[in-house]
UniProtKB/Swiss-Prot annotation:
Auxiliary protein of electrogenic Na(+)-coupled sugar symporter SLC5A2/SGLT2 and SLC5A1/SGLT1. Essential for the transporter activity of SLC5A2/SGLT2 but not SLC5A1/SGLT1. Residues 52-114 are cytoplasmic. Keywords: Cell membrane, Membrane, Phosphoprotein, Transmembrane, Transmembrane helix. It comes from Mus musculus (Mouse). GO terms for cellular component: apical plasma membrane. The chain crosses the membrane at residues 29-51. It is found in: Apical cell membrane. Belongs to the PDZK1-interacting protein 1/SMIM24 family. This is PDZK1-interacting protein 1. Forms a heterodimer (via N-terminal transmembrane helix) with SLC5A2/SGLT2 (via TM13); this interaction enhances SLC5A2 transporter activity. Interacts with PDZK1.
Length: 114
């Protein structure tokens, strides 16, 4: 085995180095830039796709809406027959499905000029 290895090494040392083929020529600078931008955009698209599928959060079971029986309204899981006390302060006395627009105090409202 050692003799075969030395024979191959000797033959490779005696052979003249191969001449590489010359390319068709350098690309124009605008073409190099166009290719670079296209490759960059493809890489960014791949990163966004991986991020979208990898970092997807599962919906919390408490915030999912399910319909039970013939009920027309969606009911939060575990909230059947209960209501939010926060919404009772906004209810209108004119209609059961209407809400009042509560005016905020002037100091608490932040407005910016356009």
């Amino acid at each position: 085995m050692l003799a075969f290895s030395l024979l191959v090494l000797g033959l490779l040392a005696e052979v003249a180095p191969a001449s590489c083929q010359q390319g068709l020529g350098n690309l124009q600078p605008w073409m190099q830039g166009l290719i670079a931008v296209a490759v960059f955009l493809v890489l960014v698209a791949i990163v966004f796709a991986v991020n979208h599928f990898w970092c997807q959060e599962e919906p919390e079971p408490g915030s999912t809406v399910m319909i039970i029986g013939n009920k027309a309204d969606g009911v939060l899981v575990g909230m059947d027959g209960r209501y939010s006390s926060m919404a009772s302060g906004f209810r209108s006395s004119e209609h059961k499905n209407a809400y009042e627009n509560v005016l905020e105090e002037e100091g608490r409202v932040r407005s910016t000029p356009m």
